[in-house]
Amino acid sequence: MKTQGAHVSTDPRAAIAAADTALGIEFGSTRIKAVLIGPDHEVLATGGHGWENHLEGGLWSYTLDEVVAGLQSAYASLVADVRERYDVTPVSYGSIGISAMMHGYLAFDADDNLLAPFRTWRNTNTGRAADELTRLFGFNIPLRWSIAHLHQAVLDSEEHEPRVARPTAPAGRGPHPA
């Protein structure tokens, strides 16, 4: 808040109790980060969860269960930080923002069932597809883009490919368990 050019700080504990805060969650490739921002745009608390993709069937992946567990862990560590700093537990937020990796491949059917393990940005098996798409569009298509993964699945006649109704990356999915 500003009053006649002077900066007036808001009490963090009161802001948290009044839900005058913003919660941010970011799903990065090696860490899930959580941050609580106050009305003065100051960081009030943070939390996080380290994770690492793993080889599954020759491809780098995370499971959706790992996504949910990582979110829960990052959020729990944020809440613990809030409690330790301010002796209050947040129960509501003024706003929530979620950011996730924009690269990789999640393939869902018409009923929103995951058809193949998530393929992370780290996979480089999409060279042929990326080259073909780059030539077709006259625009560089990186190996890690979802469209390169989808086209590679078509080129490889992967079992799941005919049932893909919605290909996306983590940024297009969000961690909403069924």
Give the location of each predicted region.
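N-terminal glycine/serine-rich phosphate-binding loop of ATP-dependent small-molecule kinases
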Residues: 1-116
